[in-house]
Amino acid sequence: MKLVFAGTPEVAVPALDALIASGRHEVAAVVTRPDAPAGRGRRLVASPVAQRAEEAGIEVLKPVKPRDEEFLARLREIAPDCCPVVAYGALLPRVALDIPAHGWVNLHFSLLPAWRGAAPVQHSIMAGDEITGASTFLIEEGLDSGPVFGTVTEEIRPTDTSGDLLTRLAFAGSGLLVATMDGVEEGKLKAVPQPADGITLAPKITVENAHVDWSTPALRVDRVVRGCTPAPGAWTVFRGERLKLIQVVPVPERTDLAPGALSVGKNNVYVGTGSYAVELLWVQAQGKKPMRAADWARGVRITDGEPLGA
């Protein structure tokens, strides 16, 4: 089939690579978000998908809005059979959805109808799910509500951050997306409506969502830190300044600390929660590089019992 691939961040690149490597489908063009400022100099930089497409000699379309008439006209000229989508980053209007003969097929990083929305991986970790996966579905105007072509499952490991899990899902999902394109072309793959039960929503994680509440249980604190790593980054407050929490580990045997209270050993830093303590392993103070929590604690000379979050 002739395809137009829509995607923007690094997590979409494995799927683009898989479609190119399949040899069965022609990726005639790529649709991605416009160049964005990046780095200290805030220079405009093309998206990872745009960079990969340019390396492969594929036409790149960067509409400010996917309803722009110039973009729609070019899409009609290309006349794609299907448009696979991975983390494009903009809502597609009905006029665009109607152009490809077989519609737009999205690779979503959850087992739909669970975790519809922008941050399914973060929410699955923060909720304590043990299994997640990826789904391919036909895009409709509703939020991730279209009928599903196929799924692949992935175990959530106890130490997974959202970055770890998303990387694995990006590669597992790329194979699923290629298989879905093959099935659509053959006419043998039928999309199945999502069940009405089991719908959960996964809105974008805000900075406030990433603020750690030390009165919650240790397992919840651990899940928030892992779910918000690498972005937006879990955080707390220490001596009036924000402290980023990069890695913690629950310590069930430490039940002597009040929520938010610090305890410093020779090479360990513990914090009380609503259940038992967690050990801080890696942190990042404002304006500083990430460092081991024990090194940070020595540098700021913590007093036992000093609070976090105040």
UniProtKB/Swiss-Prot annotation:
UniProtKB keywords: Protein biosynthesis, Transferase
The superkingdom listed in its UniProt entry is Bacteria
EC no. given is: 2.1.2.9
- So where does (6S)-5,6,7,8-tetrahydrofolate get bound? S110, L111, L112, P113
Is Repeat included in the keywords of this UniProt record? no
Gene name linked to the record: fmt
Family, per the entry? Belongs to the Fmt family.
Q: Per its database record, what is this protein's job?
A: Attaches a formyl group to the free amino group of methionyl-tRNA(fMet). The formyl group appears to play a dual role in the initiator identity of N-formylmethionyl-tRNA by promoting its recognition by IF2 and preventing the misappropriation of this tRNA by the elongation apparatus.
Q: NCBIfam families from the xrefs?
A: fmt
Task: Give the species this sequence originates from.
Answer: Streptomyces avermitilis (strain ATCC 31267 / DSM 46492 / JCM 5070 / NBRC 14893 / NCIMB 12804 / NRRL 8165 / MA-4680)
Q: What class of enzyme is it?
A: transferase
| Gene Ontology MF terms | methionyl-tRNA formyltransferase activity
* PANTHER family, per database record: METHIONYL-TRNA FORMYLTRANSFERASE, METHIONYL-TRNA FORMYLTRANSFERASE, MITOCHONDRIAL
Q: Does the keyword Transferase apply?
A: yes
GO terms for cellular component: cytosol
Kindly list any coiled-coil regions of this protein: none
Q: What is this protein called?
A: Methionyl-tRNA formyltransferase
* Catalyses which reaction(s): L-methionyl-tRNA(fMet) + (6R)-10-formyltetrahydrofolate = N-formyl-L-methionyl-tRNA(fMet) + (6S)-5,6,7,8-tetrahydrofolate + H(+)
